[in-house]
Amino acid sequence: MTAIPHQRITSLKGQRQALQQRARTIRAATGTPYSSEVHLLLGQSYLDPASWQELTASGGVRAAVRRAQFVRRYRHLLARLEAAIERYEQHSVAQNSPGAERMP
């Protein structure tokens, strides 16, 4: 069964929020600032509430095409963000593990 368009958009919004929370949790636990890649991708994936609302509420053929294009691009962007967060987490944990050299 295929999700209706606004459910796909809502799902992507939730996925982005979960990724952002994961990055925040890593930063809080390790004290390591976001990598430039994570910071950039969080910025690129941000949409203001009005934009999310417009994507889910609009109707018609043009809106359907716009949503389909958005979903395709946004999934790719979120996959890149997830990979960047995984690298950030690995780097942060390695940097803050016992025995790791600390910079003054």
Q: Across the structure, where does each feature detected by a protein language model lie?
A:
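Short, charge/polar-rich alpha-helical segments
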Residues: 1-37
